[in-house]
A protein has these predicted regions:
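Conserved class I S-adenosyl-L-methionine
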Residues: 59-68, 161-211
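A short glycine-rich, Lys/Arg-flanked "PGG" loop and its adjoining helix->strand segment in the class I
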Residues: 146-158
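Conserved alpha-helix/loop element of class I SAM-dependent methyltransferases that forms part
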Residues: 27-59, 75
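A short SAM/SAH-binding and catalytic strip from SAM-dependent methyltransferases
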Residues: 131-144
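N-terminal, positively charged/glycine-rich alpha-helical extensions of SAM-dependent methyltransferases
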Residues: 1-32
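A short acidic, Gly/Pro-enriched loop at the edge of an enzyme's catalytic core
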Residues: 122-132
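Class I SAM-dependent methyltransferase SAM/SAH-binding core
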Residues: 63, 73-122
């Protein structure tokens, strides 16, 4: 029987309504260079290991755990030529976008193998090991994030690296206030909730602290409906301070 988190049904339904991230599709490689998705650069930065010489015995094995609409997958393919890439997510709608994104960018031609599959990161025991695991903005949407971290740790090859991104309490205090306010007003995580959430922002006085902070910091990031919903309407998320983060890592 496949494994899943208790929050999987509600989270997958949320991302089927709001495929995320909402970055536009384009023809050709993704823009710019993002070193955190280049395995050679990450290894050189984190452990001081030089890239393997040309003709190394095997390609990098990369897992994109929670790939969403494929923005990270696209970079992972283009920045790691010849790699073997597995990208998984629980949202069918997001994966449909991911497949179209990578097709249009030419990502499959850059790597030895690219698989994009609807699977939980908790259900990958038959895969791996992986030299590099990318999990950005995923574990904090599990009901039991510790189980997700243990599952990813078990998939790492000896000497492998895990690129993990989690929400931080300190960077989200104003977002948490807005989330709590919307929740108390009965704003849901569907299309109606999205409309009401946006209207509430516009109805707040221009001098309101939360509106002002949103307009100064997040307005551009949340222009797309999926990005607004992911930030303010998500049905399942947690965040960490340093102490809880260290305890979380130790739990794996």
């Amino acid at each position: 029987m496949s494994a899943s988190d208790a929050a999987t049904p509600v989270v997958s339904a949320f991302y089927d309504r709001f495929p995320y991230p909402a970055d536009p599709l384009q023809d050709g490689p993704p823009p710019g260079y993002n070193w955190r998705w280049c395995v050679d650069s990450v290894r050189a930065f984190c452990v001081g290991v030089l890239p393997p010489p040309a003709g190394a015995p095997r390609p990098w094995r990369i897992l994109d755990a929670g790939c969403g609409t494929g923005v990270s997958t696209d970079y992972l393919c283009h920045l790691n030529p010849g790699a073997r890439v597995l990208a998984v997510d629980i949202s069918a709608a997001a994966l449909e976008v991911a497949r179209e994104r990578t097709r249009r960018s030419g990502a499959p031609a850059q790597v030895e193998d690219l698989r994009i599959e609807q699977r939980s990161l908790l259900d990958l025991a038959d895969e791996g090991p992986f030299d590099h695991i990318n999990s950005v903005g995923v574990l904090h949407h599990l009901r039991e994030p510790e189980a997700g971290l243990r599952a990813l740790a078990d998939l790492l090859a000896p000497g492998g690296l895990l690129h993990l991104f989690l929400y931080a309490d300190g960077g989200r205090w104003e977002i948490h206030r807005i989330q709590r306010s919307l929740s108390r007003l009965g704003v849901g995580c569907d299309a109606a909730g999205l409309r009401l959430g946006r209207r509430l922002f516009s109805d707040l006085p221009e001098t309101n602290r939360l509106r002002r902070h949103h307009e100064q910091r997040w307005a551009l990031d949340t222009t797309a409906d999926a990005n607004f919903a992911d930030m303010y309407l998500h049905p399942q998320e947690s965040s960490y301070d340093v102490r809880r983060l260290m305890a979380f890592v130790a739990s794996s």
